[in-house]
């Protein structure tokens, strides 16, 4: 019987940890759009590769930007 090597999934590294980001500004709309899909929903961390700490920071920044009407709420 032939030996079949299992493929390992590549672990995504957090881009924000690599760049030593300590704060995500809610006024930086271009940066926030990277973590949202085309309908305006926040992408989960398993898709965008954020760690838990930075995913919370992204979530609060997007929520603040939505309240200030800088980023639209979810579009249908």
UniProtKB/Swiss-Prot annotation:
Molecular-function annotations in GO: small ribosomal subunit rRNA binding; structural constituent of ribosome
Any Pfam family matching the protein: Ribosomal_S18
GO cellular component: cytosolic small ribosomal subunit
Entry keyword set: Ribonucleoprotein, Ribosomal protein, RNA-binding, rRNA-binding
Superkingdom classification of source: Bacteria
InterPro entries associated with the record: Ribosomal_bS18, Ribosomal_bS18_CS, Ribosomal_bS18_sf
GO biological process, one term: translation
NCBIfam families hit by this protein: S18
Quaternary structure and partners: Part of the 30S ribosomal subunit. Forms a tight heterodimer with protein bS6.
Protein family membership: Belongs to the bacterial ribosomal protein bS18 family.
General function of this protein: Binds as a heterodimer with protein bS6 to the central domain of the 16S rRNA, where it helps stabilize the platform of the 30S subunit.
Protein name according to UniProt: Small ribosomal subunit protein bS18
Gene giving rise to this polypeptide: rpsR
């Amino acid at each position: 019987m032939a030996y079949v090597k299992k493929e390992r999934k590549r672990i995504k590294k957090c881009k924000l940890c690599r760049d030593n980001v300590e704060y995500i500004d809610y006024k930086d709309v271009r940066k926030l759009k990277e973590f949202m899909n085309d309908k305006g929903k926040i992408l989960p961390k398993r898709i965008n590769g954020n760690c838990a700490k930075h995913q919370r920071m992204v979530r609060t920044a997007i929520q603040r930007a939505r309240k200030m009407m800088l980023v639209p709420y979810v579009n249908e």
